[in-house]
């Protein structure tokens, strides 16, 4: 029997920082864009509500891993765009290595060649 989608919540907690940093590596983004992109790329399995996403972005900014800046565009509301800092890139590289090691270990235990 397959687990319901809420089972992804525990995995999301551990991987949220990695997901956000990975998306910001590609280009600066605002919170709503990050939320929708994660949902779309995960086919709806992962969803970040603003009550989860923005506190995470504020913590990352406070730790010097991302930098936020306000951007105003014509006929649009002001949005805060976040970009990865040099320290954020270093942490992202470490987290990716760690994640790959974790996935490999899980695959070996479960007897699967590829996760």
Indicate residue ranges for each PLM-predicted region:
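Short, intrinsically disordered or compositionally biased N-terminal tails of bacterial proteins
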Residues: 1-9
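Amphipathic alpha-helical dimerization/coiled-coil segments
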Residues: 2, 90-115
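Short, contiguous hydrophobic alpha-helices characteristic of membrane insertion segments
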Residues: 8-10, 57, 113-115
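N-terminal helix-turn-helix DNA-binding core of bacterial DNA-binding proteins
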Residues: 8-54
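Acidic-residue sensor for enzyme active/binding pockets
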Residues: 17, 61, 95
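A cross-family signal for key residues in well-ordered alpha-helices
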Residues: 22, 36, 58, 93, ...
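Canonical helix-turn-helix DNA-binding module
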Residues: 42-78
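Basic, amphipathic "hinge/linker" alpha-helix immediately C-terminal to the N-terminal HTH DNA-binding motif
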Residues: 74-96
